[in-house]
């Protein structure tokens, strides 16, 4: 049942790099970044504390290097840098809306942004700032989905909001299979057991271990984030039962 007030006080939003790309084939669509920032600003206006993890696939994917015979570790480091670019872009969009925002990077680059620590993240959240986590986990072989689950646990998030291209988790790709059905809710174990493409195995397992729900929704629906924060909207909830 939908309420006029948010049912979460502190959340982690995971946005893929592809989401920032919009209809372009590469890079950042500023209009899309501005719209996502507007949705985050709406959540802040409701009093919700928001942390954000952004991917880097719109600029570079580390696995692309490995698939062509290159060094995976170097490729992943390049992908981490791509997430910093995206984090800075989203922070710029938020600041245009007068939303106090800080970027915390898992890779030290003090001339560009602050370095991540749990203490810093909790301090900034308590001060009402949006905290954007960049650089993934800071380690190769871990996806930004895993970074999202890790940061959610560290910041004490009540839920992970996974913004995707569709409005929830489906039995198959709804863009390819018209008979695909959307799940209203699942358990973490069901997601892992069915091999559903939500987040990678490590991310879902970490969320399960820390009893953090994962809410999958369409990041392209303007105002959808705030609507789901109040219990409405189309989504799939992954939680313990």
From Swiss-Prot:
Gene3D superfamilies xref list: Acetylglutamate kinase-like (3.40.1160.10)
Activity regulation as described: Allosterically activated by GTP. Inhibited by UTP.
Role according to the record: Catalyzes the reversible phosphorylation of UMP to UDP.
Region annotation Involved in allosteric activation by GTP: where it falls in the sequence: 22-27
EC nos: 2.7.4.22
Record-given protein name: Uridylate kinase
Species: Agrobacterium fabrum (strain C58 / ATCC 33970)
Catalytic activity field: UMP + ATP = UDP + ADP
Annotated CDD domains: AAK_UMPK-PyrH-Ec
Gene assigned in the entry: pyrH
Subunit description: Homohexamer.
Pathway note: Pyrimidine metabolism; CTP biosynthesis via de novo pathway; UDP from UMP (UMPK route): step 1/1
Locations listed in the record: Cytoplasm
UniProt-annotated binding residues for UMP: 56, 76, 137-144
Family from the record: Belongs to the UMP kinase family.
This protein's UniProt keywords: Allosteric enzyme, ATP-binding, Cytoplasm, Kinase, Nucleotide-binding, Pyrimidine biosynthesis, Transferase
GO terms assigned for molecular function: ATP binding; UMP kinase activity
Family annotation (PANTHER family): URIDYLATE KINASE, URIDYLATE KINASE PUMPKIN, CHLOROPLASTIC
């Amino acid at each position: 049942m939908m309420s006029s007030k948010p049912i979460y006080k502190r959340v982690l939003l995971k946005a893929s790099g592809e989401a920032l790309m919009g209809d372009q084939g590469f890079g950042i669509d500023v209009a899309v970044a501005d719209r996502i920032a507007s949705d985050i600003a709406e959540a802040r206006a409701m009093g919700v504390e928001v942390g954000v993890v952004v991917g880097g696939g719109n600029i570079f994917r580390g696995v692309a290097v490995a698939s062509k015979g290159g060094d995976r570790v170097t490729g992943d480091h390049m992908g981490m840098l791509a997430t910093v670019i995206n984090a800075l872009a989203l922070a710029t969009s938020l600041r245009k809306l007068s939303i106090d925002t800080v970027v915390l990077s898992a890779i030290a680059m003090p001339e560009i942004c602050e370095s991540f620590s749990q203490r810093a993240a909790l301090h900034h959240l308590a001060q009402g700032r949006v905290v954007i986590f960049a650089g993934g986990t800071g380690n190769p072989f871990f996806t930004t989905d895993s970074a999202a689950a890790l940061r959610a646990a560290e910041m004490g998030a009540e839920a992970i909001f996974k913004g995707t291209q569709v409005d929830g988790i489906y039995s198959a790709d709804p863009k390819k299979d018209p008979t695909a059905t959307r799940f209203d809710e699942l358990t973490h174990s069901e997601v892992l057991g069915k091999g559903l493409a939500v987040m990678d195995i490590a991310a879902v397992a970490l969320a399960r271990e820390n009893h953090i729900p994962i809410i999958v929704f369409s990041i392209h629906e303007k105002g959808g984030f705030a609507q789901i924060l109040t219990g409405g909207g189309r989504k799939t909830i992954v939680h313990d039962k």
